[in-house]
Regions:
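N-terminal flexible segment immediately upstream of the FAD-binding catalytic core
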Residues: 1-73, 77, 89-118, 286, ...
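Flexible, glycine/charged-enriched surface loops at secondary-structure junctions
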Residues: 9-17, 21, 33-39, 228-241, ...
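N-terminal glycine-rich flavin-associated loop
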Residues: 27, 50-82, 100, 104-148, ...
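A glycine-rich phosphate-binding loop feature that marks nucleotide/adenosyl-phosphate handling sites
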Residues: 90-93, 148-154, 243-245, 333-349, ...
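Mobile "lid/hinge" segments at catalytic clefts and subdomain interfaces of large enzymes
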Residues: 131, 135, 152-342, 358-364, ...
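Ferredoxin-type iron-sulfur electron-transfer modules in oxidoreductases and energy-metabolism complexes
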Residues: 592-624, 628-700
Length: 700
């Protein structure tokens, strides 16, 4: 896509710290929100829920779209990168960058619900928990339900094209986006929604100085020139968020957009139009800054029913996923024997896991939405009758070979129909992450290939091959989460504080990406590309579509200033030649790397009965943001000071990050014992121990 000579992509300049005071002076009068470029604020936004850390240039907390526009326009003129951010719950590192961070979560979090049209118009910083709280007053809900939805923001859900455990029914966020208000790379405020292809043809101009006109030209070229390649290279999956959402564009243009549950074509889908708001879904803030969105809502289900099926092995459970889907569940979740063993040893989960037969090596949690209680019981009864019991076999003409006829894999089943019983089963399923992330050792269960999506018919072979990869690299992992749509969360145990561990990280990712391509999958089914997976998009989609991604990026963002490095790699003039060279290195900017150091500067007075002692506890927070939520949506106690102040520095995550930063050299060495650190970071902690109880990692 050609662009005007005045807007050619630039080489990213190195930002000089001496420029920071001038930036503060320039930005402060431009906005009504807060401008924070101090060391504490920058360190607070250097991490998210991923394995990555990158210190931002500074942070702005906007109060309005006008604030956002002013900041983006200033940064465009001065060639400074910009990063939009919500709750900072990204698992792939897409919400950390050397940029001016726009934190929408502090002020831009309002929503209005229209029960007549079953839609919500909401600001980008509202959490999905708060949005659903407002929608529930009208018997409605926002369908996509990411695990940390009560803490993650709507803008992040759009940027990530998020979904969750119930994607079998609700699909991804892009299905629900009707319209978005955005700030383009030059600060222009514009709205994207449905547009006729003929309008793209009439208004598009690849040489214009108007970014929107260049966008129209780029989208039209994709629709006219790249449909066949998109059809050929995009995985045929409901759960694919790798790369840009080009297949959604093609579906819109053809009038073949599927329903959220994949059961047919959306009757509202008409050929000849595309919804450019859907294109922004999954773009991770690299194309435009979303400030507000109108999204469709769904009626809340009348009731639910749950069956818990037990299996002799993980592979048996994987074989059973496809037949279970024939029963129309809303969720099919898996836990393997690794997690079950760990759960049995954890006091908080011991009673729940104790309900299972002793020889259980894997479980599938199968949930149904039902019209009423009787309907729910019948759905479970039909499932159990079909999938649980003795293996049925038939002998073929070849008496040496026994084949199965409608084989029943599950060895045992339990049912839950009232809310308390269902919650017990789900508690066991959700035990996975807390157990895995509570390690205080240097080796940790890291998210980097935890989100691959595979066609369910290929799950058994894929899992077996994945286990071989782990064996080859001398490590282990647990397989858990969304078996129904083929998205298994796998976090290998890796010590990135060693050079060998970093090599192991990249080696596993390379081998697993090969498996994903072989089995027709995607490297990301819900968590996005970010720093962890951008490197592999070139292998997944091929050179031609990789080039299309980069051309589209240039049309939207001519100077490549919006969250640079994510989805389509580095700047064009820095792009290495040849497919063997990665355009983005997943091993850069790791939170824990071979160069990482930790020094308290004092001997702790208390003894810590865990691996790595005090250091292990300081490094325990993985950044999920579970401490950032109101009582009404997150429950529990954690964290009362954040709930009162709504300031990151007063969250458990904020305190943990700054404490670690003071001991690893990110802050001045004398900072830890200084009066400012005590007053700002530690003194307002009320000592309630809510974090120790509620934090999934057990941060104290």
């Amino acid at each position: 896509v050609a662009i005007s000579a005045s807007a050619q992509p630039i080489a990213m300049r190195v930002f000089d710290a001496s420029e920071r005071p001038d930036l503060v002076d320039d930005l402060t009068p431009l906005v009504d929100g807060d401008v924070r470029f101090d060391d504490y604020s920058r360190q607070l936004y250097a991490t998210d829920a991923s394995a990555y850390e990158r210190l931002p240039i500074g942070v702005v907390l906007p109060r309005s779209t006008d604030d956002v526009s002013a900041v983006v326009e200033y940064c465009f003129e001065h060639e400074i990168p910009v990063l939009p951010r919500g709750g900072g719950t990204s698992l792939a590192g897409q919400t950390v960058n050397e940029a001016v961070v726009l934190d929408f979560s502090r002020y831009m979090d309002e929503a209005s619900i229209d029960p007549e049209t079953e839609t919500a118009t909401a600001e980008a910083g509202i959490t999905l928990g708060k949005l659903n709280e407002a929608a529930a007053e009208h018997g409605l809900t926002f369908g996509p339900d990411p695990a940390w939805g009560d803490k993650s923001a709507l803008g992040g859900a759009i940027g990530n094209n998020s979904t969750g455990a119930h994607s079998l029914v609700y699909g991804k966020t892009d299905y629900y986006i009707e319209e978005v208000e955005t700030v383009l790379a030059d600060g222009t405020v514009t709205t994207f929604g449905e547009v006729e292809i003929e309008t793209l043809r009439e208004a598009g101009d690849p040489t214009s100085d108007d970014i929107r006109e260049r966008i129209y030209a780029s989208v039209l070229e994709i629709l006219e020139e790249e449909r066949a390649e998109i059809d050929r290279r995009y995985p045929r999956l409901k759960r694919n968020v790798s790369g840009y959402n080009l297949d959604a564009l093609v579906e819109d243009a053809r009038g073949t957009r599927p329903l959220a549950d994949g059961t047919g074509t959306d009757p509202d889908s008409e050929a000849g139009t595309v919804n450019l708001a859907r294109l922004l879904a999954g773009s991770e803030g690299t194309l435009a800054v979303v400030t507000e969105a109108t999204v469709a809502l769904e009626p809340e289900p009348e009731t639910k029913a749950v069956a818990l099926l037990t299996y002799d092995s993980l592979l048996d459970a994987m074989e059973d996923v496809a037949p279970i889907l024939d029963h129309g569940p809303c969720a099919v979740e898996v836990m393997d024997d690794v997690l079950l063993k760990l759960a049995r040893d954890a006091p908080e989960f011991e009673e729940v896991v104790g309900l299972l037969p002793e020889d259980t090596h894997s479980v599938l949690l199968v949930e149904f939405y039902a019209d009423d209680a009787d309907h729910g019981r019948q759905q479970v009864a039909d499932l159990v009758a079909d999938r649980v019991g003795n293996v049925e076999t038939e002998v073929t003409a070849n008496t040496n070979r026994v084949t199965t006829n409608k084989r029943r894999y599950a060895s045992h089943a339990m049912e839950a129909h009232d809310a308390e019983a269902r919650a017990t089963f789900w508690k066991m399923r959700k035990a996975g992450m807390p157990i895995l992330l509570s390690r205080t050792s240097d080796a940790k269960h890291i998210s980097f290939i935890e989100d691959c999506a595979i066609p369910v018919e290929n799950l058994p072979a894929y899992v077996e091959a994945f286990q071989d990869v782990l064996d080859d690299h001398g490590t282990n992992a647990s397989f858990y989460a969304h078996a129904g749509p083929g998205v298994l969360h796998v976090r290998p145990l890796v010590d990135t504080k060693t050079a060998e561990g970093v090599d192991q990280l990249e080696g596993i990712a390379a081998d697993v990406t090969d498996l994903v391509v072989e089995y027709g999958g995607s490297v990301s089914g819900e968590h996005g590309d970010g720093r962890a997976r951008t490197q592999w998009n070139r292998k997944l989609y091929g050179e031609r579509l990789w080039g299309v991604f980069r051309d589209l990026k240039t049309a939207f963002d001519p100077k490549w200033l919006l969250n640079p490095g994510n989805i389509c790699g580095v700047l064009p003039d820095e792009e290495p030649s040849g497919t063997a060279v990665a355009s983005h290195d997943m091993t850069e900017d790791l939170r824990f790397s071979p160069s990482y150091e930790f020094e308290t500067g004092f001997d702790p007075a208390l003894e810590w009965a865990n691996e790595n002692g005090f250091q292990g506890m300081v490094e325990l927070c993985h950044g999920c943001g579970g401490c950032r939520g109101p009582q009404s949506t997150t429950g529990g106690v954690m964290c009362p000071t954040y709930r009162a102040a709504e300031e990151e520095i007063q969250s458990t995550r904020g305190r943990a990050n700054l404490l670690r930063s003071a001991m690893n050299g990110s802050l001045d060495e004398d900072e830890l014992l200084g009066s400012e650190f005590g007053a700002e970071v530690m003194d307002l902690c009320v000592g309630c121990n809510g974090c120790e109880v509620d934090c999934p990692s057990g941060v104290d």
